[in-house]
């Protein structure tokens, strides 16, 4: 019997594919899968100010990490929340709101989260200078560019987008 990914029954088709097919599709394309968390508190979104990572240091970015081998997308997002923010998220509280295919060989998944348990902490202070709640309608200029584009897609209710192909 094929294992089904039933954790997101109302999300885009990819999330409903059997897990084996998800992995096969990503491996064939050689894509790195990034898992982004859009934690919302009212009109504010949680961002981390990056440092000492070698990628976009000094810029704000959503909490993000990579999907690991033999891990479902929801399990990866939940793991990243615990590792980076010290919080627990129930799978039912993850909402896949956007999928972005980047020309750089990345498939970026964006999960909106409005409910979690535990106190938010900067669990990776060596990579993150601070955690800041920023109003969604007043984002600063120093946000990682593809994340800013993804947030615009989400505001425009576009659940699939690309970056770097133009």
Regions found by a protein language model. Give the residues of each.
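General beta-strand recognition
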Residues: 44-46, 95, 108
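Acidic pyrophosphate-coordinating catalytic loop
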Residues: 25-31, 53, 98-110
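Acidic, metal-coordinating catalytic segment for phosphate/diphosphate chemistry
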Residues: 2-36
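Short connector loops at helix/strand junctions that flank enzyme active sites
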Residues: 30-34, 40, 57, 62, ...
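A short coil-to-beta-strand element that immediately follows conserved catalytic motifs
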Residues: 88-98
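Conserved Nudix-box catalytic region and its N-terminal flanking loop in Nudix hydrolases
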Residues: 41-83
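Active-site-adjacent beta-strand/loop module that shapes the phosphate/pyrophosphate-binding cleft
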Residues: 41, 99-121, 132, 136, ...
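Nudix hydrolase/Nudix homology domain
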Residues: 2-3, 125-166
